[in-house]
Regions:
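Single conserved hydrophobic/aromatic residue that forms the stacking wall/gate
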Residues: 1-12
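Hydrophobic alpha-helical transmembrane segments
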Residues: 22, 51-59, 120-124, 169-173, ...
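Hydrophobic core segments of alpha-helical transmembrane domains in multi-pass membrane transport
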Residues: 29-33, 58-65, 88-98, 121-136, ...
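Structural signature of hydrophobic alpha-helical transmembrane segments
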Residues: 2, 46-60, 186-195, 232-239
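Membrane-embedded hairpin module used as a gating/binding unit in multi-pass transport
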Residues: 105-197
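Cytoplasmic-side transmembrane-helix entry/capping segments in multi-pass membrane proteins
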Residues: 19-28, 78-85, 213-220, 237-239
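Membrane-interface helix-loop-helix junctions at boundaries between adjacent transmembrane segments
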Residues: 21, 32-60, 64-120, 256, ...
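Short helix-perturbing small/polar motifs within transmembrane alpha-helices
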Residues: 15, 28-42, 60-69, 225-230, ...
Length: 289
């Protein structure tokens, strides 16, 4: 049985009653910092904090599926991170409640560097493995890849269903190499957050992203660094570029020029939107996109 869930991905329902919502549940963990905030950071007496954190986490899980299904019509599938958008709005509500009672959320930036050689070797091996696996496991690969590159990516088009697993594996590997090359090109470090962004670009190589629609968005962020006050390798800007490829369908549908514009604009919005939810939404760029 096939369905299109609130993340926008058309896929097969898992053979369990919860199967239809597994994908939404995985993306909904973007609001997991809220649970920690209520359970431990607020320092409520006794076990009240832990119980409140559990209650808040369960409430997030209950609210996100119907809310995401409704909010998908706002961007009409041109943002691949629909749950990130939904989580940003829901996180803003929770943080607003906290602030109305006098509690201010804080930001804690932990940003490592100096491990580029180790992580680069791992990423190159991983993505080259995907490409080789795709090359060795399918026929008619060139035409299948052309089919993928012709797609806009809107509403998370399922490339595995469209062109097969082999072409999708190659596309995943290519996307991962592009993301890695971008970080190195702008002299950014390979660390937890940037590797997360690279792996996200690679993962969505199976449903929405390919070289033709992500490169214009990345270029738009680079263009913004020439005219705006921040540096291209600032932590927030690096993440805005990598996760900003959520807007890849705009480049796929309307052309590279509008993809550049989307990346240029989103790089500014992403730097301000985190103040709304106090950093509680881990998919902040999905919210700004």
């Amino acid at each position: 049985t096939r369905f299109r869930n609130v993340t926008g991905v058309q896929t097969c329902a898992l053979p369990i009653s919860f199967g239809e919502h597994v994908y939404t549940a995985l993306f909904a963990t973007s609001l997991s910092p809220i649970v920690t905030e209520f359970a431990f950071v607020l320092q409520l007496p006794g076990r009240a904090g832990i119980l409140l954190g559990i209650f808040i986490g369960v409430s997030v899980g209950l609210i996100i599926p119907p809310l995401a299904a409704h909010l998908k019509v706002v961007h009409k599938g041109y943002s691949l991170y629909n749950i990130g958008f939904t989580a940003g709005i829901l996180g803003t509500v929770y943080v607003s409640l906290l602030r109305s009672y006098g509690y201010q959320t804080g930001f804690n930036m932990i940003w490592s560097d100096g491990n580029d050689r180790l992580f680069l070797g791992f990423l190159l091996l991983l993505f080259i493995f995907f490409i080789l696996l795709g090359l060795c496991s399918g026929r008619g690969l060139a035409s299948s890849l052309k089919t993928i590159f012709r797609q806009s990516g809107r509403s998370c088009e399922d490339f595995i269903e469209l062109s097969g697993i082999s072409a999708s594996l190659v596309n995943i590997g290519i996307n991962g190499l592009i993301g890695t090359a971008y970080v190195l090109l702008v002299c950014g470090p390979l660390n937890g957050p940037t590797i997360g962004g690279i792996l996200t670009i690679a993962g969505f190589g199976a449903c929405g992203k390919h070289a033709r629609n992500i490169i214009p968005v990345l270029f738009g962020v680079m263009l913004g660094s020439l005219t705006k006050v921040w540096n291209i390798n600032d932590p927030a800007v690096l993440l805005a570029a990598l996760f900003g490829t959520s807007l890849a369908p705009i480049a796929g549908r309307y052309g590279w020029a509008w993809g550049v514009v989307a990346g240029f604009l989103n790089s500014s919005v992403a730097l301000c939107s985190s103040a709304l939810h106090g950093g509680m939404n881990l998919y902040n760029t999905g919210f700004s996109a």
